[in-house]
Regions:
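Nucleotide-sugar donor-binding catalytic core of glycosyltransferases
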Residues: 1-41, 48-208, 257, 280-283
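Small beta-barrel nucleic-acid-binding modules, principally OB-folds
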Residues: 162-163, 228, 232
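Conserved acidic donor-binding segment of nucleotide-sugar-dependent glycosyltransferases
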Residues: 214-223, 231-236
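Long, compositionally biased intrinsically disordered regions
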Residues: 263-264, 275-283
Length: 283
């Protein structure tokens, strides 16, 4: 495993000069799309290549600056396999002819742990709101905060993040317009929060094994969010039971060790189309 800085990601052919690529049976890249999207000519020279993609929801998110960019990029890479973290996103890529496979986002079970402390924050959200991609998230959360005691927070260390999740009773997830569930949903569930999440639809919940009223609560808009919140307050015992089942579910479905097996299964399938052009052709 190798970790690449931004400059190395921006010029992969230079980075790979000293790597005996023929000694590897598989190549898996988990890099920033904005750094690799102009390097399709070089990427086509890497044999048995799999790209791990977490941001392809931006390809069809309303108002996204990257609209259509992911499909255009992957169409330039015939024979390349893509692991996508969204079920609907994976179907979107497949419809465009991309060899895409669904493996959801997850969390480190050794870090995201249940702590024995009081949950003194009734409603909480931890995360960014400044990006244009999160404008709908910001609108929903700020609107909710005007009528409910929602705490919108940022944390600065990994330990602080876990400790704060363990203080939240109900985690308000607002993945509005993203078409998939971000990792923070599963991290919150792993830390014992009751997850109140925006329904993504298009088979996303079924693919993840998420069941409304069983291991999380789902809402469709602000009105239904407020209704589900009121239900949770009126039925604290049932709400706690859902939180417990949610934690059990993500530990079995979204922990890194479980996802590693899924990724291994995807990349172990033989590649039928491998590069036949040497890297030096593209200098």
């Amino acid at each position: 495993m190798r970790f690449l800085g931004k400059d190395q990601q921006r010029c992969l052919r230079r980075y790979f000069v000293d790597i005996a690529i023929d000694k590897y049976e598989r190549v898996i890249l988990d890099l920033m799309f904005k750094h690799v999207r102009t390097q399709s000519r070089f990427l086509r020279t890497l044999p048995a290549l799999t790209l791990y993609e977490e941001d392809a929801y931006l390809d069809f998110m309303p108002g996204s600056r990257w609209s259509g960019a992911f499909v255009r990029f992957y169409r330039q890479l015939p024979g390349v396999r893509v692991i996508s973290t969204g079920f609907a996103v994976t179907n979107h890529l497949r419809a465009a002819g991309v060899d895409a496979h669904f493996v959801p986002k997850g969390f480190d079970p050794a870090r995201m742990v249940l702590q024995n402390q009081k949950r003194d924050i009734e409603l909480g959200f931890i995360g960014r709101l400044g990006s244009a991609a999160y404008s709908a998230r910001r609108t929903l959360l700020e609107t909710l905060a005007k009528v409910e005691p929602l705490e919108i927070m940022r944390t600065h260390t990994a330990n602080e993040y876990v400790e704060t999740l363990n203080r939240i009773n109900i985690f308000i997830s607002a993945d509005v317009g993203l078409s998939e569930y971000m990792a923070k949903n599963f991290e919150a569930m792993a830390c014992g929060c009751l997850l109140l999440a925006k329904r993504q639809g298009r088979g996303e919940e079924e693919a993840l094994g998420l069941e409304d009223g069983v291991n999380l609560l789902l809402y469709d808009d602000l009105a239904s969010l407020l209704e589900r919140l009121e239900w949770a307050r009126e039925h604290p015992g049932l709400a706690q039971s859902i939180a417990v089942k949610g934690r059990e579910h993500v530990l079995a479905r979204n922990a890194y060790d479980k996802l590693a097996r899924e990724i291994s299964d995807v990349v172990s399938v033989p590649f039928t189309n491998v590069s036949s052009q040497p890297w030096w052709k593209f200098w």
